């Protein structure tokens, strides 16, 4: 009687092999696109024939933040070193050449309103 591989027999029992596979799915990509315009023209300004261009009409501005007074030269003989720093241009020491600028010059209006009697 011959034994067939009895020395190499494995014990009988239950054995299980676990194989884990993870599937990675690509996350969806959202593509944003602008809505389609009906016309391809860019918006533009349209002027009528009666539009007045007042850019170069020598009009004075009504909102003024400051008035420019040119500085005197340091070597100017009319300036006094011993004068106080509170001197202003309204003390009468202006030269005859200095004129008021456009904003300092006040227009002379004639009163044309009539009061009912």
UniProtKB/Swiss-Prot annotation:
Biased amino acid composition, Polar residues: 1-13
Amino acid composition bias (Basic residues), ranges on this chain: 33-44
One GO CC annotation: nucleus
Any single GO BP term: mitotic spindle assembly checkpoint signaling
Taxonomic superkingdom: Eukaryota
Annotated stretches, region: Disordered: 1-61, 73-117
Signal peptide boundaries: none
Localization, UniProt: Nucleus
Basic and acidic residues bias locations: 47-57
UniProt entry keywords in alphabetical sequence: Nucleus
GO molecular function: protein phosphatase 1 binding; protein phosphatase activator activity; protein serine/threonine phosphatase inhibitor activity
Main location as per UniProt: nucleus
Pfam families, sorted: PPI_Ypi1 (PF07491)
Biased composition, class Low complexity, residue ranges: 14-27, 76-92
Database matches in InterPro entries: PPI_Ypi1 (IPR011107)
Family: Belongs to the YPI1 family.
Function summary: Regulator of type 1 phosphatases which maintains protein phosphatase activity under strict control.
Protein name per Swiss-Prot or TrEMBL: Type 1 phosphatases regulator YPI1
């Amino acid at each position: 009687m011959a034994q067939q591989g009895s020395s190499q027999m494995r014990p009988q029992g239950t054995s299980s092999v676990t194989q884990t596979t993870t599937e990675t799915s690509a996350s969806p990509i959202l593509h944003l696109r602008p809505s389609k315009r009906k016309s391809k023209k860019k918006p533009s300004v349209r002027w009528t024939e009666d539009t007045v261009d007042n850019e170069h009409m020598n009009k004075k501005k009504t909102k003024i933040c400051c008035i420019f007074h040119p500085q005197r030269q340091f070597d100017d003989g009319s300036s006094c070193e011993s004068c106080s720093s509170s001197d202003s241009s309204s003390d009468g020491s202006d030269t005859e050449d200095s004129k008021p600028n456009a904003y300092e010059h006040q227009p002379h209006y004639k009163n044309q309103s009539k009061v009912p009697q």
